[in-house]
Amino acid sequence: MLSQGIAGPRFEKPEEVVEWMGAMQAQDIRAAKWAVGLRIASPSLTAVQEALDTGRILRLHVMRPTWHYIPGRDIKWMTGLSTKGLLSKFRFYAKHFSLTEEDFLRSKPQIEEVLSGQHLTSQEVLEQLHSKGIALDEPIVKMYLSFGEADGTVCSGIEKNGKHTYALTCERIPDAIELSHEEALAELTRRYFRSHGPATLEDFVWWSALNIGEARNAIASLGTEMITERYNDREMLIHASSPGLVGEVEIDERNVFQFLPPFDEYLVSYKNRLDCICLLYTSPSPRDTERS
């Protein structure tokens, strides 16, 4: 809980939370804002919303084909790590609509034209395409927007009445950070194990959707930054900058309840959740019963 920033929250800004965590699952918009807010020293929904509206935090599909919050300035290298895997999954989903990636590529210029200078909901994208004589159903438009996220063209815009909107990445984040593939792998690995450690290699593979070879190599590339311990006959890893190791956080040692939102990183970012919560207090998913 120290690593996750739940015990002894120390961050001043919402974007600092998301950068520390690497990425935060965010399919439930209200729950995701709560997850960020509870990790801020002075929780503020207004501050979280402002970070989203200004693009300091973005919400999009990255890593696994699930909504995540990521730091806005990191969108280029984070989507770069995810593109291959996401496109593979979206191609599979697209088959249910008799769509191909080539269909998306043909429609991409029209979608970019519609989004240019605007932040639109999927319904508004649909309506503007219809006004141009392009007849598409909303599920197909959403599928095309997902493809656009996967290739880095499209990101989140400013919410409209609590609804997610889309914008062009080049307009929203013109100064996105660029990293080489190896640098990006190392940075994602560093962020995961400092904020989610101790964790296993299998936990990291589950969270990041990297293949196990890439994950192993990324961990090895960090050298002495990584600390290894054994717990219940498993190898556990943690980054040397984790607050539980460097002793930079003061915590209230009294027994306290922590109310976590649905899909909080504390529970969803590990292959084996039994390390996080006692079996007596939960109904585990099938994968929780499989020891790594």
What are these regions (language model features)?
Residues 1-123, 127-135:
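Phosphate-backbone binding and catalysis cores of DNA-processing enzymes
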Residues 225-279:
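Non-catalytic regulatory appendages
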